[in-house]
Amino acid sequence: MNSLFASTARGLEELLKTELENLGAVECQVVQGGVHFKGDTRLVYQSLMWSRLASRIMLPLGECKVYSDLDLYLGVQAINWTEMFNPGATFAVHFSGLNDTIRNSQYGAMKVKDAIVDAFTRKNLPRPNVDRDAPDIRVNVWLHKETASIALDLSGDGLHLRGYRDRAGIAPIKETLAAAIVMRSGWQPGTPLLDPMCGSGTLLIEAAMLATDRAPGLHRGRWGFSGWTQHDEAIWQEVKAEAQTRARKGLAEYSSHFYGSDSDARVIQRARTNARLAGIGELITFEVKDVAQLTNPLPKGPYGTVLSNPPYGERLDSEPALIALHSLLGRIMKNQFGGWNLSLFSASPDLLSCLQLRADKQYKAKNGPLDCVQKNYHVAESTPDSKPAMAAEDYANRLRKNLKKFEKWARQEGIECYRLYDADLPEYNVAVDRYADWVVVQEYAPPKTIDAHKARQRLFDIIAATISVLGIAPNKLVLKTRERQKGKNQYQKLGEKGEFLEVTEYNAHLWVNLTDYLDTGLFLDHRIARRMLGQMSKGKDFLNLFSYTGSATVHAGLGGARSTTTVDMSRTYLEWAERNLRLNGLTGRAHRLIQADCLAWLREANEQFDLIFIDPPTFSNSKRMEDAFDVQRDHLVLMKDLKRLLRAGGTIMFSNNKRGFRMDLDGLAKLGLKAQEITQKTLSQDFARNRQIHNCWLITAA
């Protein structure tokens, strides 16, 4: 009896143990990452030929304690290598693990290699050559703490390499894991199997090989036992011949069918090639088709299983499309696949919850470094009057109502950017803004008392409903999380895409950036204030302080201002403002852009202006500003400096976003100024519910 070890992916150990026992293995013992077992020579070859789950089959040769590199050398040399392989064979060493002595795996591999070579040369035998790419013998050494385990890798290449997939192709899951996913899916051979996101077809090919009794090792060309002196070629040929007979019989007798589709024509072509090389190409129909086009290939029966490994994202900006994808798949399953089973393998349980289905079973497994889950569902048969419920239905209804109200209004006003929803329902705490054919969803960060998983799931429901109600492509939705911003954090950079979208606002053309910053470059609540500035600016010298991207300057310029001066501390936003001005034909000396600390510039400037717009931050303590600024505390000082620059008969439009702001009217009067609040006049329909989003004043000489 041979003592052997089969390695596998984490989470598949018990499944592998059952498989090995079915092959005839005895004394199976599960450990993390594999199974120890025993068997005769025939079982050695059968496990290599038939195991769908094992990554490698190892023949343990011994262990040694490693307190120095000499201990490792002597421990390896103690094995009778000349009985393991002939000097004419090539070999390679795979070394894993480190300790205080062996701190580099390459160094460990070199010491093992030296010990094996010296074992031959000391017996005056020819020195065996190292071949890292295609060796006849692979030696595996695993160092754990002070113990090195030495084994012969009888697999050669990993057993996931079945021989049907081009090694250059990218596979999101290995064939061994794919086989486990098939086994755990609840699918029964003889019933239909469909993968709507099949990629290169690995799940379907593994299922078809399982269903037709085709051994996973049948198409492999190289094995790790070819240079092993104890290799029994006669028994191996018997095992191989039996596998070939069973494969022919299984294929001839199999009557059901497999269906695969993917939106990428290139991977579908690769899938067809892989299936043909695996010997089961005639059983699988592959189509180039998006999930949105998915239909039941057997509407009259029999029932089958939908099995897939859908994509998942690690970045926030990829989630809207994936949320929409999973929500869509859930709706299609309910509408078209009643009575079928569904099994999905994913690294994102949150995305799976977008299906709006209840899982019957779930399994955990590792896909490389990723913790993954496989969930199995049974889709209830639909009745004629059954109607699938939409996620976040209350939110969807409100958004639909708002869309009907605002879409026509915006078209009549001549604006492309407006707010569709602003936390209208407390439990759906987001803002939804439309920018032409794009949508930005801003999630207001939930309080810490709210369960994070529930909050994330609600956000996913909101995104799915938004895409459905507005009928937009998922890649046209941008998701952001918004917290209360202070000072410089309000302009925090989020990305580096540099993608700008041209939008119209009345007669102005403006650039917005929906992804790189928390704000987009256009404050929608100030839309009417900007229009008023345009109407007030004809023939006047206009000053825009804390200008941001200069959209107010654009309106003033288009309104006929004699000159415009735009001041902001940020070079990025001034360059943006320059682009906005250029887009509207506002160039030349009449339109100045100044990079400066606005408060310092205001104190030192000695020019005169007819119309001044200032929209300062509520609070700022930027390192580049000389002093901390508080709009409630400091607005009179601000007005005193502004008055000095205001030409006789001129007007200041002053706006800020501080809730509960109180204008010091008595203090203004002492400065010889008076204020008229125009907040309500500057709030458009889409911000009517949020009357404290800003306050706005016209200030003139008393």
Swiss-Prot record:
SUPFAM superfamilies named in the record: S-adenosyl-L-methionine-dependent methyltransferases
GO CC terms: cytoplasm
GO molecular function, one term: 23S rRNA (guanine(2445)-N(2))-methyltransferase activity
Family listed: Belongs to the methyltransferase superfamily. RlmKL family.
Domain spans labelled THUMP: 43-154
Recorded superkingdom: Bacteria
E.C. designation(s): 2.1.1.173, 2.1.1.264
InterPro entries the record matches: 23SrRNA_methyltr_KL, DNA_methylase_N6_adenine_CS, RlmKL-like_Mtase, RlmKL-like_Mtase_CS, RlmL_1st, SAM-dep_methyl-trfase, SAM-dependent_MTases_sf, THUMP_dom
Pfam families reported for this sequence: Methyltrans_SAM, RlmL_1st, THUMP, UPF0020
Subcellular localization, as worded in the UniProt entry: Cytoplasm
Enzyme class: transferase
First and last residue of the signal peptide: none
Reactions listed under catalytic activity: guanosine(2445) in 23S rRNA + S-adenosyl-L-methionine = N(2)-methylguanosine(2445) in 23S rRNA + S-adenosyl-L-homocysteine + H(+); guanosine(2069) in 23S rRNA + S-adenosyl-L-methionine = N(2)-methylguanosine(2069) in 23S rRNA + S-adenosyl-L-homocysteine + H(+)
Main location: cytoplasm
Keyword field: Cytoplasm, Methyltransferase, RNA-binding, rRNA processing, S-adenosyl-L-methionine, Transferase
Descriptive protein name: Ribosomal RNA large subunit methyltransferase K/L
Function of the protein: Specifically methylates the guanine in position 2445 (m2G2445) and the guanine in position 2069 (m7G2069) of 23S rRNA.
